[in-house]
A protein has these predicted regions:
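Conserved, well-structured interaction surfaces
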Residues: 46-54, 58-64, 86-168, 180-188, ...
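Extended ligand-binding clefts on enzyme/binding-domain cores
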Residues: 250-358
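Long, intrinsically disordered, low-complexity segments
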Residues: 23-25, 86, 116-119, 193, ...
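Flexible, polar/acidic helix-loop-strand segments at domain edges
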Residues: 94-100, 322-389
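Membrane-proximal, proline-rich intrinsically disordered regions
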Residues: 24-75, 245, 475, 486-498
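Short, surface-exposed recognition loops and adjoining beta-strand edges that mediate ligand/DNA contacts
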Residues: 39-43, 47, 67-88, 174, ...
Length: 498
């Protein structure tokens, strides 16, 4: 695909969305509407109380899992090249070189901003619906369930703000979908808001794995703890990182999936390593209804014949490939790098690249043809997008221990053992950070954020300027719609409820 249709999506803050009815009784049982109904509902019928929650899951997987947004998130690390043909979506190349002055009108960056706020807006509406249901509940068990559902929604609102604050810095906290001409809030206030939201989630979500939920894959207490730990890690607050990750580890609920190759493919969907996935399904049918990833997999797929065919973006850099080779990686290399002019163990031939295009692709987005439902031809159909993994929890735990003068060998070596590597004794911080670099390569910009938080970005990323390159600029179309976004951030003043 030489040129991708640019979906010019313009989002205004405030957001005035038309919120229509969601027909989802379970967030994978029917096609998502990506919407939440607020008016015209019988709030006395508690059997429908999960409907607004399912709408938020549908919105999150469609918008937080957007392929164009993912490109903006992942492309700034030294493990990723833009890929694609040399001139296609050249703005991703500018982003990787931190030439932000060339991105102010980039449609995908505006889409990233808007996608996050769409999740916020949908969450706000869902919470309004849940409050209306709560007014008619009498039993404690029903009230507790309502609080759990609210916590599921608030998790995704917190995650949207997690993306916004780490990608853009100072951003508005939108608490009311009717707010007009909002100002930015400080990064510190946004992070505090995220922590407060996640504390509510931790207190009200069940202490189970996502695959143990009544709605399989739903977020749980441990998903919220992991998100909070990640933000605390970015803020170098290691006491809390240790406490949060210890709670997850000591729960005994999670384990590393035994096959790294299959972890990112159909057999690894919602395994015991998973803390968060965006879920998709073809319902086991070769045609007809499908809950699709809307090209997240195709964006990173190789040039080739369907169903192993995509747009050739997101290329592993020579730097990360050399590191894998130097370390003697074989298990993780086979999975992470989908090499051209080669045949995978599942028998899919990956053609030679066109001149100027990638010689390897993101293997973590590869779904073998023999695992797809017969009749389906879309690259990655019926696979899930992995977002949070237990391996990351173990590595955060190991790093927190070492930073606090403790021994982090045990969690680190669990990850290394799965990769077929020898254990390390008395692991150093540098060894743990390199393990993160390899284990989490080509996943959600983890490498970039690790370099920033450890103050190594200037050393490792050509063009990175400390104090300037950490955050994307707010898209110009958003500033045109709301000039207050150019003003200095204001203190956050939460509403006080009596």
């Amino acid at each position: 695909m030489k040129n991708i249709l640019k979906k010019q999506i313009y989002w205004r803050i405030p957001l005035a969305f038309s919120l229509l009815t969601s027909s989802c009784s379970d967030y994978l049982d029917k096609l998502p509407e990506n919407t939440v109904e607020v008016e015209g509902i019988d709030y006395t019928n508690k059997s429908n109380m999960y409907m607004p929650v399912s709408g938020v899951y549908a919105t999150a997987r469609g918008y937080l899992g957007s392929w164009s947004s993912y490109g903006c998130i992942i492309v700034r690390g030294d493990d990723v090249n833009k890929g694609g043909s040399p001139t296609d979506q050249i703005e991703y190349e500018y982003a990787s070189k931190f030439q932000y002055d060339r991105l102010t009108t980039f449609w995908a960056l505006s889409g990233l901003w808007g996608n996050c706020y769409y999740v916020v807006s949908t969450s706000n509406s869902a919470l309004e619906s849940l409050e209306n249901y709560a007014k008619h509940l009498t039993s404690e068990s029903d009230k507790q369930l309502n609080a759990q559902y609210a916590a599921e929604v608030r998790f995704f609102r917190a995650y949207a703000y997690f993306q916004l604050v780490n990608l853009f810095g100072d951003v508005p906290l939108l608490l009311d979908n009717q707010e007009l001409n909002v100002f930015k809030n400080t990064k510190e206030d946004v992070k505090k808001y995220i922590y407060d939201e996640l504390d509510y989630c931790i207190a009200n979500l069940p202490a189970i794995r996502p695959n143990e939920s009544e709605h399989p894959g739903a977020v749980t207490k441990y998903t919220a703890e992991m998100l909070k730990a990640k933000q605390k890690m970015y803020d170098n607050e290691w006491d809390e990182v240790l406490a949060l990750t210890e709670d997850i580890v000591n729960s005994g609920k999670f384990e590393l999936y035994n096959d790294f190759y299959e972890l990112f493919k159909i057999p690894g969907k919602l395994c015991n390593e998973s803390l968060l996935e965006y879920q998709f399904t073809d319902f086991g049918n070769g045609s007809g209804d499908i809950v699709s990833s809307d090209n997240w997999f195709a964006f990173q797929g190789p040039r080739g014949e369907a169903p192993i065919s995509g747009w050739a973006f997101i290329e592993p850099t020579e730097k990360i490939r050399n590191l894998f080779s130097k370390r003697g990686e074989s298990v993780r290399a086979e999975t992470t790098f989908l090499m051209t002019d080669a045949t995978t163990r599942d028998g899919d031939y990956i053609p030679v690249a066109q001149p100027g295009e990638p010689t390897a692709y993101n293997g973590k987005a590869y779904t073998p043809a023999n695992q797809m439902t017969p009749g389906r031809t879309g690259y990655g159909d019926n696979n899930n997008i992995r977002v949070f993994r237990y391996a990351d929890v173990l590595l955060m735990n190991a790093e927190a221990k070492v930073r606090k003068g403790q021994n982090g060998d045990a969690p680190l070596n669990l990850v290394r053992e799965r990769a077929g590597l020898a254990p390390i004794a008395n692991a150093t911080l540098d060894q743990i950070l390199e393990e993160r670099q390899v284990e989490l390569a080509l996943e959600w910009g983890e490498r970039f954020f690790d370099l920033v938080r450890t103050d190594r970005a200037t050393q490792e990323l050509p063009g990175f300027v400390k104090g300037e390159s950490e955050y994307y600029p707010i898209p110009q179309d958003q500033i045109d719609l709301n000039p207050n976004l150019e003003a200095e951030p204001v203190p956050f003043e939460p509403e006080v409820t009596e």
